[in-house]
């Protein structure tokens, strides 16, 4: 075999994290300090690929029965690569990965790729390889609404008016560590509207913030010290992503979300190439929440795809 394939173990965390940090398509979500916060929920089956003793790539993954899944605790996944990746070797890697998986009792693969906005240089060798080697087919496509800052679209009138309302009402925006206060707003909204809870508990998001204080950031909008809205952003090398956003009834009325987005998109992170509002699927289906997409498009966002592929072994 060309590649030595090694299953990740905790003693390799330093090597894993160092590769992620210098990769061309990795983000802090692939850092083991992030991935392992919910290690009890998944049977981790992440893999490391060595070429002549040098680490060539990483695959964040978990096992579910006879299926290898790009790690289901992460928004996106796929092969993490560096600048030395070549198309021919990546085709070989996936051919040998399939052999390895068959030997270890797998029959199916579910593969999430890293969306192109997170690529620091061209990084779609994996997509070419799975089409050539694995007979991969598209299993699911979600829509993420994104602003490309170099070609930013002016906010729609409805959003500009909401921003003006917030300014006239005297709302103040601040970078905050009051995750507890915002989680109360978020929990109440999700419970009332969807009968659900945030993916992260308060304790988990506070833990992750302490581990990644510059990558996980909370902004709140207040009036007289009362939190009317908040947005948690995930900050990677070139993408700022709205991971959570929520407002109280009064906050919605006064445009509290809009004034926070103005601060984040047009001021604090304006120099970042992309701002991503997150995906808008309805309960993990192929349907989109049209009203939510409409709101995001009002800020000048437009669609990119978050894809999952599958193949049989």
Task: Show which residues each predicted segment covers.
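A structural micro-motif
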Residues: 3, 107, 171, 272-273
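A conserved beta-strand-loop-helix scaffold within acyl/acetyltransferase catalytic domains
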Residues: 3-52, 56-67, 115-251
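Short, high-confidence coil segments that cap the C-terminus of an alpha-helix
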Residues: 42-44, 103-106, 216, 270-272
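Aromatic (often tryptophan-rich) hydrophobic motifs at membrane interfaces
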Residues: 50, 58-61, 80, 86-98, ...
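Short, flexible, mixed-charge acidic loops at enzyme active sites
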Residues: 67-72, 292
């Amino acid at each position: 075999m060309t590649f030595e394939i090694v299953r990740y173990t905790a003693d390799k965390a330093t090597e894993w994290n160092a590769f992620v940090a210098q990769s061309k398509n990795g983000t802090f979500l692939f850092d083991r300090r992030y991935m392992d916060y919910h290690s009890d929920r998944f049977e981790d089956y992440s893999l490391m690929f060595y070429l002549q003793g040098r680490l060539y790539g990483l695959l964040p993954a978990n096992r579910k029965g006879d299926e290898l899944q790009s790690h289901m605790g992460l928004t996106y996944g796929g092969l993490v690569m560096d600048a030395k990746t070549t198309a021919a070797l990546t085709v070989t890697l996936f051919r040998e990965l399939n052999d390895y998986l068959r030997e270890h009792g797998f029959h199916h693969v579910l593969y999430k790729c890293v969306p192109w906005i997170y690529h620091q240089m061209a990084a779609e060798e994996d997509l070419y390889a799975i089409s050539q080697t694995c007979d991969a087919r598209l299993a699911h496509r979600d829509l993420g609404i994104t602003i490309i800052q170099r070609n930013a679209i002016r906010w729609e009138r409805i959003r500009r008016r909401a921003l003006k309302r917030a300014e006239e009402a005297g709302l103040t925006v601040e970078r905050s560590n009051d995750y507890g206060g915002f989680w109360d707003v978020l929990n109440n909204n999700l419970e009332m509207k969807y009968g659900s809870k945030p993916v992260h508990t308060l304790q988990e998001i506070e833990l992750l913030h302490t581990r990644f204080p510059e990558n996980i950031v909370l902004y709140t909008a207040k009036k007289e010290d009362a939190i009317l809205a908040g947005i948690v952003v995930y900050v990677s090398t070139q993408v700022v992503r709205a991971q959570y956003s929520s407002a109280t009834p009064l906050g919605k009325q006064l445009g509290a979300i809009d004034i926070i987005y103005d601060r984040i998109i047009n001021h604090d992170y304006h120099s970042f190439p992309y701002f991503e509002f997150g995906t808008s699927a309805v309960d993990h289906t192929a349907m989109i929440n049209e009203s939510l997409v409409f709101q995001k498009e009002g800020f000048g966002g437009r669609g990119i795809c978050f894809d999952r592929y599958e193949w049989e072994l």
